[in-house]
């Protein structure tokens, strides 16, 4: 296990370096700069600002300085938020995105597994058809449309919940449901498919022959093996939800990482775009490694060491 972890960490460092390099190159390949949109900025003032942030240095030197900062944990200053570093902004915005993401993750997991299990326990029934149709709609319909529908019907027409900002539990309902809808539908499909396969296994037939009830078979024998594909899916899903959905945070005016990222693109805030990209990539890599380490604990047939399964 230790050798596997170190091997994965070594690969993760290479992946992050490639991501930093490619993103840095793309940012500097785009015409213009972070201060090009300033109206009638005097050349002397513009030159002074660029010198302050070392934007007048050769690109290779900027890359070396930035890479050195990343190694020490410094993601640099924000070009558009005067006096604030990228680390500070991430530190302020990430807890909000994390709260939104964690709540959405819990709703998606609980709702998806429950719906998939009920559907698999009653195949070809009305409940099964309803879950299948709803999960198909949930996967197919874009998140921004789901959000817009919830805002209009639940927020404006029914007036049950606020439709903007992030100030308390009632403000969380619509954003969480919007963000959880697609992964919940996908988890329901994965759970249903996995359970239908498991229910065909010999040990399930033996359990039924012994007179065990449906819920006992589900919870003690079937569900653990059926949700293995769900666990694999949770790594990238958790990273995506924890860093916040750009669309959801924009629709509901939530001051999380997603909204800051969208603003930074319009403002060409290079360091912030790079910082968010690095942060998001590191989180994805870390969570994928974590899921790979947890996977063998759930299914002993899976091993992380080469050659041990031969």
Q: Language-model features: where?
A:
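Hydrophobic alpha-helical transmembrane segments of membrane transport/permease proteins
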Residues: 16-64, 80, 155-174
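Hydrophobic aliphatic residues
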Residues: 26, 30, 38-42, 71, ...
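Alpha-helical transmembrane segments of integral membrane proteins
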Residues: 2-3, 90, 94-127, 143, ...
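Membrane-interfacial helix-loop-helix junctions in multi-pass membrane proteins
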Residues: 51-60, 75-83, 187, 263-271
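Membrane-water interface segments at the C-terminal ends of transmembrane alpha-helices
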Residues: 23-29, 66-68, 133-162, 180-182
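An internal, D/E-rich "acidic patch" concept
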Residues: 56-113
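Juxtamembrane/transmembrane-helix interface segments of polytopic membrane transporters
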Residues: 19, 23-27, 147, 151, ...
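N-terminal signal-anchor/signal peptide hydrophobic helix marking the start
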Residues: 6-16
């Amino acid at each position: 296990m230790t050798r596997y972890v170190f091997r994965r960490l070594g690969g993760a460092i290479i992946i992050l370096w490639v991501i930093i390099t490619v993103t840095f190159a793309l940012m500097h390949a785009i015409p213009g700069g972070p201060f090009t949109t300033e109206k009638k900025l005097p050349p002397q003032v513009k030159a002074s600002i660029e010198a302050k942030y070392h934007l007048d240095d050769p690109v290779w030197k900027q890359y070396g300085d930035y890479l050195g900062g990343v190694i020490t944990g410094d993601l640099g200053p924000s070009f558009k938020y005067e006096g604030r570093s990228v680390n500070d902004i991430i530190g302020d915005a990430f807890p909000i995105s994390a709260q939104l993401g964690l709540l959405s993750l819990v709703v998606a997991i609980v709702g998806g597994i429950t719906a998939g299990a009920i559907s698999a326990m009653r195949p070809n029934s009305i409940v099964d058809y309803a879950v299948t149709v709803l999960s198909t709609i949930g996967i197919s319909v874009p998140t921004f449309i789901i959000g817009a529908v919830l805002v209009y019907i639940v927020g404006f027409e029914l007036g049950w919940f606020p439709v903007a900002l992030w100030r308390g539990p009632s403000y969380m309902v619509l954003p969480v449901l919007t963000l959880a809808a697609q992964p919940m539908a996908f988890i329901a499909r994965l759970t249903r498919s996995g359970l239908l396969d498991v229910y065909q296994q010999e040990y399930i037939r033996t359990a039924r022959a012994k007179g065990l009830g449906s819920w006992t078979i589900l919870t003690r024998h079937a569900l653990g093996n059926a949700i293995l594909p769900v666990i694999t899916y949770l790594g990238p899903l958790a990273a995506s939800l924890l860093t916040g959905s750009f669309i959801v945070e924009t629709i509901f005016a939530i001051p999380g990482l997603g909204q800051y990222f969208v603003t930074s693109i319009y403002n060409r805030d290079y360091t912030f775009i790079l910082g968010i990209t690095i942060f998001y990539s590191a989180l994805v890599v870390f969570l994928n490694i974590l899921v790979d380490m947890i996977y063998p604990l759930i299914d002993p047939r899976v091993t992380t060491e080469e050659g041990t399964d031969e």
